[in-house]
């Protein structure tokens, strides 16, 4: 174990500010009103306000990673008579398909391939052909490739067909402006350690209250019962059903404060966009090519093809970058040899410039 701090160029966990880390130095009692009312309830209100100004929405915090919340939503929102259309073009859409299968949830998997944008006309045709579909679920920012999926167009379809709409906005909420009411989203799922720039430990769901209230008794799990977690927080002023990740929650409260100080989601989105554009321009100047065309990219993470040089090994490239204080991600695309670089978190223009210099130094196969 090393005490050296690296710059994490990943989609989360990510590099956090010193003050977010310092917020975890305080020990909270999970029964204390200062914590539940003063911190948890404030977070819930702030998250809902970030998602929409419209009435009728609420937020629920849930222990665990983002996948725990995805599974909680699927397992709680769909009744035994329901069926979900899962739009998948990467590992995280595929994970929803796997979850649905394990929980015995009726589903239709529309897999459009890892490097293709979902075809909205194809989704329209599926909905038209199968009236038993009651829900639609999809990922917004698919970090497998860095693709940003068309949640607005699919939301319009969900509204037109009267379907419940579930969006995994794990790596976009807080970093890309959105109004979930305008997008017709019924359940939005995200995590503490993504664009809000907190640390791992809990995820959250922002839901249409009317939909959530109908979930009573549906859950396939005790601990992942979204309705029960919501009622506990509502009825007990922020109390969690089971042990609250107190230090992570305090860090998240500080991260929300820093998001506001930066200028809100619009300002953070602008920084992320500039980071990503500078990264892509610099990498192309070094001879790297992006997996996706520019119009498909999110401002969150970018996949680059691995060099074709026979001397290149990702593990060696990674090691040389890490020696210089930078950590990147291996590829996750099954049919393409690539690696990924994220640009969210406490990462600024000077960091991208320093990273590009480090990459040039680490390109041992060109020496």
Curated annotation (Swiss-Prot):
Metal-binding listed as a keyword: no
Domain of life according to the entry: Bacteria
Modified residues (N6-(pyridoxal phosphate)lysine): 194
Keywords in alphabetical order: Aminotransferase, Pyridoxal phosphate, Pyruvate, Transferase
The keyword Transferase appears for this protein: yes
Entry function: Involved in phosphonate degradation.
Family per similarity comment: Belongs to the class-V pyridoxal-phosphate-dependent aminotransferase family. PhnW subfamily.
Protein name: 2-aminoethylphosphonate--pyruvate transaminase
């Amino acid at each position: 174990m090393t005490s050296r701090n690296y710059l994490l160029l990943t989609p989360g966990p990510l590099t956090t500010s010193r003050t977010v880390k310092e917020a975890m130095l305080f020990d909270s009692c999970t029964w204390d009103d200062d914590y539940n009312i003063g911190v948890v309830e404030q977070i819930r209100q702030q998250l809902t306000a970030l998602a929409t100004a419209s009435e009728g929405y609420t937020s629920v915090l849930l222990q665990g990673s983002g996948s725990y919340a995805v599974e909680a939503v699927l397992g709680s929102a769909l009744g035994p008579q329901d069926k979900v259309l899962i739009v998948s073009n990467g590992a995280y859409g595929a994970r929803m398909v796997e979850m649905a299968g394990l929980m015995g949830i009726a589903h239709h998997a529309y897999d459009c391939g890892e490097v293709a944008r979902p075809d909205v006309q194809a989704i329209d045709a599926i909905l038209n052909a199968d009236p038993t579909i009651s829900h639609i679920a999809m990922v917004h920012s698919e970090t497998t490739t860095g693709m940003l999926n068309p949640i607005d167009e699919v939301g319009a379809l969900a509204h037109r067909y009267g379907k419940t709409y579930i969006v995994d906005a794990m790596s976009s909420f807080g970093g890309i402006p959105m109004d979930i009411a305008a997008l017709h989203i019924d359940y939005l799922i995200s995590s503490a350690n993504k664009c809000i720039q907190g640390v791992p430990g809990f995820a959250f769901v922002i839901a249409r209250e009317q939909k959530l209230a109908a979930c009573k008794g549906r859950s396939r799990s005790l601990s992942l019962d979204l309705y029960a977690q919501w009622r506990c927080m509502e009825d007990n002023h922020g109390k969690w059903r089971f042990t609250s990740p107190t230090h992570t929650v305090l860090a998240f409260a500080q991260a929300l404060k820093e998001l506001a100080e930066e200028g809100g989601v619009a300002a953070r989105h602008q920084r992320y966009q500039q980071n990503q554009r500078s990264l892509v321009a610099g990498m192309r100047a070094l001879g790297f090519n992006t997996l996706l065309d520019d119009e498909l990219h999110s401002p969150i993470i970018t996949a680059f093809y691995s060099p074709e040089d026979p001397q290149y090994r990702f593990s060696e490239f990674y090691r040389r970058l890490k020696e210089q204080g930078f950590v990147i991600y291996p590829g996750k695309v099954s049919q393409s040899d690539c690696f990924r670089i994220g640009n969210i978190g406490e990462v600024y223009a000077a960091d991208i410039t320093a990273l590009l210099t480090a990459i040039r130094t680490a390109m041992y196969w060109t020496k």
